[in-house]
Amino acid sequence: MHKRLFITLLGFIILLAGCDYSKEENQTGIFYNVFVKSMDGFLHFLGRVFQDNYGFAIISIVLIVRFILLPFMLIQVKNMHMMREKTKVVQPELDAIRDKMKHATSQEERNAANQLLMKKYQSYGINPLKNMLGCLPVLIQMPILMGLYMSLKYPSSHGITEYPHFLWFDLTQPDLIMTIIAAIMYFVQPLVNSIHYPKDQRKTYYFMMVFSPIFITYASLHSAAALGLYWSISAAFLIVQMHFAHSHYKKVALHEAKKLKQKLEQNKDNSELLTEES
């Protein structure tokens, strides 16, 4: 996962470095028309809604993006806890099947064991494939973030350039304090999230705790403070979202795992009873 994040952010840096929309003749192409121009227009619309307060306009964009990504995040967190807790209950059975796969002497035996494993996953309500949603929120957010970055770096007139002030800083210029806040938030976010994972699965989050603040600091110091504001609010909102999602779905998963354990014990008792009667 940390390799995926690194490649994504590296691609983000390369793409941003290669785009120059300072000249009107360069303001063409699919990316500019679909993302940059659309984001610029949407930012101006929200700016007018908030009476030329573009700080609130950017915060609104954060909330919209986070609510769009919320279902994917909830599915991922729910599946992670369900898979972890249910797997603990049926681990001996799954290990026995994996042992058959390991010691299979033919491809047919391996395929049969693999099919049996998938059937067990399905019967217990465990779906490992849902973990593939992990990178989807990043992929959805990337074009939005790049469009916002470009619309702030090359803004059209009569918008944020005329009303750039928000709180203590200028939204169109780099701001050291906003950069520090954004870096801190992106250190805290993976730190808080890592608490909900076993120690042997926290390496990714330790990597993010180091790499993310470095990337955010570099990008914020070379960008409009509006981008730092976007990152700060987005990270803060994600911290709250993840905390409540993990707390809720951990309880749900523990309850479902308890029901599964009781069901397996009952089936075992019934099987032993039938054996004795026979």
Curated annotation (Swiss-Prot):
Q: Which GO terms describe its biological process?
A: protein insertion into membrane; protein transport
- Subcellular location(s) of the protein: Cell membrane
* Pfam families on file: 60KD_IMP
* Molecular-function GO terms, alphabetical: membrane insertase activity
Q: How does it sit in the membrane?
A: Multi-pass membrane protein
Where mainly found?
Answer: membrane
Record GO cellular component, one term: plasma membrane
> Keywords, A to Z?
Cell membrane, Chaperone, Lipoprotein, Membrane, Palmitate, Protein transport, Signal, Transmembrane, Transmembrane helix, Transport
Q: Where is the signal peptide?
A: 1-18
Give TM regions: 55-75, 132-152, 176-196, 224-244
Is RNA-binding one of the keywords UniProt gives this record? no
The UniProt record lists lipidation (S-diacylglycerol cysteine) at: 19
The answer to whether keyword Chloroplast applies is no
Positions the record marks as coiled coil are none
* Residues lipid-modified (N-palmitoyl cysteine): 19
Question: What functional role does this protein have?
Answer: Required for the insertion and/or proper folding and/or complex formation of integral membrane proteins into the membrane. Involved in integration of membrane proteins that insert both dependently and independently of the Sec translocase complex, as well as at least some lipoproteins.
**Family assignment?**
Belongs to the OXA1/ALB3/YidC family. Type 2 subfamily.
> Known PANTHER family for this protein?
CYTOCHROME C OXIDASE ASSEMBLY PROTEIN COX18, MITOCHONDRIAL (PTHR12428:SF65), OXA1 (PTHR12428)
Q: What is this protein called?
A: Membrane protein insertase YidC 1
Organism annotation: Staphylococcus epidermidis (strain ATCC 35984 / DSM 28319 / BCRC 17069 / CCUG 31568 / BM 3577 / RP62A)
Gene that this sequence comes from: yidC1
